[in-house]
Curated annotation (Swiss-Prot):
PANTHER family linked: 50S RIBOSOMAL PROTEIN L3 (PTHR11229), LARGE RIBOSOMAL SUBUNIT PROTEIN UL3C (PTHR11229:SF16)
Coiled-coil parts of chain: none
UniProt xrefs under InterPro entries: Ribosomal_uL3, Ribosomal_uL3_bac/org-type, Ribosomal_uL3_CS, Transl_B-barrel_sf
Signal peptide per UniProt: none
Official protein name in the record: Large ribosomal subunit protein uL3
Any one GO molecular-function label of the UniProt entry: rRNA binding
GO cellular component terms, semicolon-separated: cytosolic large ribosomal subunit
NCBIfam families in UniProt: L3_bact
Family: Belongs to the universal ribosomal protein uL3 family.
Entry superkingdom: Bacteria
A GO BP annotation: translation
Length: 209
């Protein structure tokens, strides 16, 4: 059965297992999410559910989106995501998806927007080697050659150059669920996940598990 939930990254901490070993974990406030729309092969050409997460003030929502939530009979939500599901028949509009849909030991993939680093050079962005820092050298952190001169008379596509780093959709695969606290809507995931604290993340079954 496919599982998915939207959450908010709280931060990182560490816990101890029964043998006293330290496990670094990321704390995620996951759900409760509500089913806002149900899509089926008959009406939309595929099976999926649209899920909402996080409360939102009315003044921040435009009229079409307000109508979308009113039609579903659910309160306004900050984030909307769609998940392809094979068992759509098991869901109804208005149903809540809570963190206890996952179990301890489950393998999950976590998606989010990575931390933005702004404009960065090739050393930080692409792990390029720097030049000598000694006296007399005039080449330290510059990008270096960008290609040949008269032939081909251009810089090839995908040349690693300085530019905007981070702030991209990123997925970390095959992480383990270490602990679940349903009463607080908290899930602890082993290791790090993308994005800053308070960033929105999506937790799904691992595709490689």
């Amino acid at each position: 059965m496919k599982k998915a939930i939207i959450g908010k990254k709280v931060g990182m901490t560490q816990i101890f297992d029964e043998n006293g070993r330290v496990i670094p974990v990321t704390v995620v406030e996951a759900g409760p999410c509500v089913v806002v729309q149900k899509k089926t092969v008959e009406t939309d050409g595929y099976d999926a559910i649209q899920v909402g997460f996080g409360e939102l003030r009315e003044k921040l929502v435009n009229k079409p989106r307000k109508g979308h939530f009113a039609k579903a009979g659910v309160s306004l939500r900050r984030t909307l995501k769609e998940f392809r599901m094979e068992d759509v028949a098991n869901y109804n509009v208005g149903d809540e998806i809570k963190v206890d849909t996952f179990e301890i030991g489950d393998k999950v993939d976590v998606s989010g927007v990575s931390k933005g680093k702004g404009f960065q050079g090739t050393i930080k962005r692409w792990n390029a080697s720097r030049g000598p820092m000694s006296h007399g050298s005039k080449f330290h952190r510059a990008p270096g050659s960008m290609g040949a001169a008269s032939d081909p008379s251009r810089t090839f596509k995908n040349k690693r150059m300085p530019g905007h780093m981070g702030a991209k959709n990123t997925t970390v695969l095959n992480l383990e669920v270490v602990k679940i606290m349903p009463e607080k809507n908290i899930i602890l995931i082993k290791g790090g996940i993308p994005g800053p604290n308070k960033g929105t993340v999506v937790i799904r079954n691992s595709v490689k598990a």
